[in-house]
Amino acid sequence: SGSCEVKTCWWAQPDFRAIGDYLKDKYDSASEMAVEKHRESRGWVETLRARYALFKPPTERDLVYYEGSPNFCEPNPETGSFGTKDRTCNVTSHGIDGCDLLCCGRGHNTRTEKRKEKCHCIF
């Protein structure tokens, strides 16, 4: 009789939060690129180069962009964005739902509501 060993290897997906954090870090440190057109024997060729020579050139693992993001604060019918006017924000938050960021520095109005609701409490 013989013995048999089985070895199984597999790749596991990292935690979803870890993936999101990784992508956010990449986004925050993305390098702006410029498109340069030059003529070669096969015709016009477009290449990307770092827009600012002051910064180190991006590596193959860095995120790059060559067009700026649209202004999400203002409405844009072309993209279907309604902007952030009249959105509800969180006065106490310093995050993306906070009034300073969500209202794009335009200020905000505070509204206090008083409601009477049955709580269905049992004592």
Curated annotation (Swiss-Prot):
Primary location: secreted
Q: Under which name does UniProt file this protein?
A: Protein Wnt-3b
Coiled-coil regions listed: none
Give the encoding gene's name: WNT-3B
* Covalently attached lipid (O-palmitoleoyl serine), positions: S1
Q: Which InterPro entries match?
A: Wnt, Wnt_C
Give the record's PTM text: Palmitoleoylation is required for efficient binding to frizzled receptors. Depalmitoleoylation leads to Wnt signaling pathway inhibition.
Q: Which GO terms describe its molecular function?
A: cytokine activity; frizzled binding
Which Gene Ontology terms describe the biological processes this protein takes part in?
Answer: canonical Wnt signaling pathway; cell fate commitment; neuron differentiation
Family, per entry: Belongs to the Wnt family.
Which keywords does UniProt give here? Answer: Developmental protein, Disulfide bond, Extracellular matrix, Glycoprotein, Lipoprotein, Secreted, Wnt signaling pathway
A Pfam family assignment? wnt
Q: List the disulfide bonds.
A: C89-C104
Q: A single GO CC term, please?
A: extracellular space
Instruction: Give the protein's biological function.
Output: Ligand for members of the frizzled family of seven transmembrane receptors. Probable developmental protein. May be a signaling molecule which affects the development of discrete regions of tissues. Is likely to signal over only few cell diameters.
- Give compartment(s): Secreted, Extracellular space, Extracellular matrix
Give the record's glycosylation annotations as residue positions.
Answer: N90
